[in-house]
Each structure stands twice: as structure tokens, then as C-alpha cells.
Amino acid sequence: MTLTYIFHSCFVLETEKSILIFDYWLDLNGVVPPFLKKDKHLYVFSSHFHEDHFNNAIFEWRKRHENITYILSKDIYKHRRANKEDADVWLAKGGTWADDTLSVWALGSTESGVSWIVETEGKRIFHAGDLNNWYARFLPEAMPGETIYSEEFDEEIDPIAHEKQYLGELKDIRKITESFDVVMFPIDGRIGNGYTLGGRQFIERFKVGMFVPMHFVASGFESAWRMKEFTDEKGISFWEIRKEGETLEI
């Protein structure tokens, strides 16, 4: 089983029987097309409607691959980024779906849409989508019940309430499972001090075999490697991704 980094939050998981593509946005190095030529069932996941996690170009893949299943978050349809008939499966938080190859659970997010748990061929995979403790750097100055204006987000935010929501989502995930073989999670240096906090809180609550950073395209590969210090402390493998198209055996 291999995992290939495409760009931003997009990965391709190839198993013996199938190919899973998560949160396709851009493919600057043309890594995806060879996967579309393989004679395996193709599953395409999109966690939410944001353009950096969903690109309706994925529907063009039907013309190049006969055996394809689209599993999309319902918010994509709600925000009119796709038509109802475009996806084979629409899921919101709490939804599940399965066939003979894989089982899927849609869990919550602190942004739009969902995060994914996927079980296939003996592995349990987690893709966070935009689930994270995004306002971590504001927590030291935050007061309960009060908002802070954030220039970068251009809105009033409540860091304490947001963290409470995030930790609540983790509790909901623990109702399904307490362990993952592979976790793909945002480690985004743009959000400033504390940008690893969400990842640290995740690995404190789950047994993780391998931690894979994502969502770091604006802050750079090396910024994501900061998380390795914390995974090393817990004996968790960490993928130091260095380029688009890089593949790892998992």
C-alpha cells in the first residue's frame, strides 16, 4: 500500500485493489493521470466545498476511468459547487457508507464539511479535511465569552469556543475508534504561533501509526516538519514530505 503526495491536502492512496484520491485541488507535476490509467476501482473524496479541497475537474475523470465512485461532503452540493447527480455518495457528519472494498465514516470539522475515516484492506486511515484548532495562537490572550478581531481571517473570532468545538469533534471521532494506521492532518504555518497545537492535541488522544502533514503549501515543506518533534516523543512515524509526487510505502 502506498501514499503519494499530490499538492496541499491531496493524496493518493493505492492499495492492492483500489485507488483513493483525497481533496484534489491542483496537480502541478502531473502525478494523478497515471493513476487514472490503472485497472483498479477509483474512489474520489472531497471533504468540503473550499476551492483548495474541491475542484470540479474531478468529474472529467469519468471519461478516463470506467470504475469510479465519488464520495463527497454534502456541503459541496449545498454551496452549489456540484450537482446532485455528480456524486455517487453524499455524506454529512455522522454519515457512513461501505462496499466490498472499503468502509467510510464522515466525521465533523471546525470549518466546512467533514473529515474522513476510511478502512480498507486492513488499514484505518484518517483525512482531516479542514478539521484543526485554527485559532490556537490567539488562545493566550483570549477571555471566555469574548471575541478577538483577526486581521488575517478578517472576522471576529472566539478562540476558546473554537478550541472547545475542535476538542468536541475529537471526542466524536473517539466514539468510532481510538487508533489509526495513517493520519493526514493540517500543519499550516500561516496561522502563526501554536500552529502545531491541533496536531499535538490529536496525537494525545489517538494511537497513530504514521502522521502525515498537509495544508502547508503556503508556509512550505519545512514548516510542516516542526510537528516531527512531537510525533518523535510519542514514537509515531512522521513523513517529512519534500516534494509533490513523493510516494511512501505504508
Where are the language model's segments positioned?
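Beta-propeller blade-edge signature
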Residues: 1-2, 100-102, 179-180
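Active-site HxH/HxHxD metal-binding segment of metal-dependent hydrolases
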Residues: 33-97
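Structured loop/turn residues at beta-strand edges in well-structured enzyme cores
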Residues: 39-40, 102, 178, 206
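Pre-active-site segment of Zn-dependent metallo-hydrolases
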Residues: 6, 10-49, 53-61, 131-176
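Binuclear metal-ion centers of metallo-dependent hydrolases, dominated by the metallo-beta-lactamase
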Residues: 4-8, 81-98, 174, 191, ...
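Active-site neighborhood of phospho(di)ester-bond hydrolases with catalytic His/Asp-centered motifs
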Residues: 21-25, 40-54, 70-75, 126-130, ...
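Metallo-beta-lactamase
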Residues: 70-125, 237-247
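Active-site environment of divalent metal-dependent phosphoester hydrolases
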Residues: 27-31, 49-54, 77-80, 95-97, ...
